[in-house]
């Protein structure tokens, strides 16, 4: 095809005052298109996801990159931290929050529209203890139980004012009438994985995390699961921040049957 085009174009064109053959123009145009194609295919999709999504998203990242010959960049932190970064202009294409509030926050800021967000996953709130030095008392999740006397160390969870797991934890502790008795023994962390690590290392005797995080560690065991009535439903919404074609393809992949199977494997419940 290249040779036939060269033979067909025997005329010359003027370019910026210089005489240039169509053959030269053809080569330059072809090179530009090739470079543009390479640049397009090399563009990375960026997902900002709640820390509790780390293992599931890492697995999906590998699958997506192989399937689409694409590159995916990940950023994991507390949903509050990620939402504020996106508000300030961080280059995220997709955002998965561990609660509705931080997705609502971005929608109110005009960073995501109602038509480009969906409730994706659910989770459970659990109480954990270190495997090597577990509490000895059996915990009962009712208002008459003396939680303060049940353990001697610290209780760790996310920041109770901003980090979703911490907010859920505070709701549960208040509804069980436990908050006032143990709030002074609370260690608040930057995200749920930090709380998990505190308990894993034995620095906190108890921790409140998601069931999926507890399942990801061999160094903690679940003492019990908080009743659903003690806190708001744990919902993970997904939002598309950048609405270009590549971002849309990635956004839709994260809701595909293949992705749902991975979420279930890691202990999440699928809401759609």
Locations of regions flagged by a protein language model:
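Bacterial N-terminal signal peptides that target proteins for export
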Residues: 5-8, 15-30
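Short, linear, compositionally biased motifs with a strong N-terminal bias
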Residues: 14-15, 36
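A short, compositionally biased domain-edge/stem linker segment
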Residues: 31-37
